[in-house]
């Protein structure tokens, strides 16, 4: 059973390596204590993707911000996907990737994001008026809209 919390790291737990504000994690047979933190809202605010939500089998780890989240090390030896990841890092600029978007009202997961009448991305996870989205960065200059509202965005690569 996964236990999570904020504050001092208890014995047998470890600090979440993705972001210091995510606190600690511990895997135990029985849950200990009750933490009422809204973990989805916290990870969305911090721009941390979740497996099965933002991270799919088709995801490229650099597009999902893994370098920023301590999820890839370019000094380490061999790892699965190393060639593609290294090529993306050193030979090109990311054209697509994870972004935090902010609307005027709550968004709907799966909503299409458009810019200048062209598809520019998709809303992936929502917490209030903040969401994680997958965007084509080359289509963001004309401004972003989803569900009839303007969006601001921040790249998370």
What are these regions, as identified by a protein language model?
Residues 64-72, 86-157:
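Glycine-rich, small/acidic residue-mixed loop/short-helix segments
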